[in-house]
Amino acid sequence: MKAIILAGGSGTRLWPLSRKNYPKQFLKLNGDRSLLQQTVERLLRAMPAEDIILMTNSDYKFHVLSDLNSLSLSVPLPASNIILEPASRNTAPAIALGIKYCVDKLGCSEEDVVFISPSDHIIKPVGKFIKYLKQAEEIAKKGYIVTFGIRPDRPETGYGYIKVRREASGVRRQAFFDVEKFVE
């Protein structure tokens, strides 16, 4: 499995803590590591550094490099896997560019599973997430598109929801469901 971390967003919904020049992924909200650092460390528990691609933009290049350097990883992410978007165009173009890099430079094929990860989420417990990530990889290898979600504990108009239909057909895992629709 490969991973593409999306770290080019401005994350301004958490204003005044995060702002365009210093967005949410670089904040240390729950300890001594930024959300980006936590994302990288989390994914390194599931795959080698050379399988992680980090998408950002030129405005955040030095924030990204600083965050990665301060992790003191025994095997750092290859510098060539840090991709600067030529222009900020939101999520889909960033993913497309990351996939193109994966195919052109890392030799990815249609059979490879690629996990798209935001850089600004707090995910706990990490061990449980890694377990589900490995299960999701196996399901994706069967031809499914897998999305992660959490059960909301209250209504929130600023986010979309995943409406599930039932336990996923052909998949015997309690935590996986067919998606009926996405509700915005």
Regions found by a protein language model. Give the residues of each.
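Secondary-structure boundary/capping motif
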Residues: 1-2, 170
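Conserved N-terminal catalytic core of the sugar/cofactor nucleotidyltransferase
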Residues: 2-5, 16, 20-23, 28-113, ...
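Flexible loop/turn segments at secondary-structure boundaries
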Residues: 12-14, 61-63, 155-157
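Active-site acidic Asp-centered loop
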Residues: 117-119
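Conserved core of the sugar-phosphate nucleotidyltransferase
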Residues: 125-184
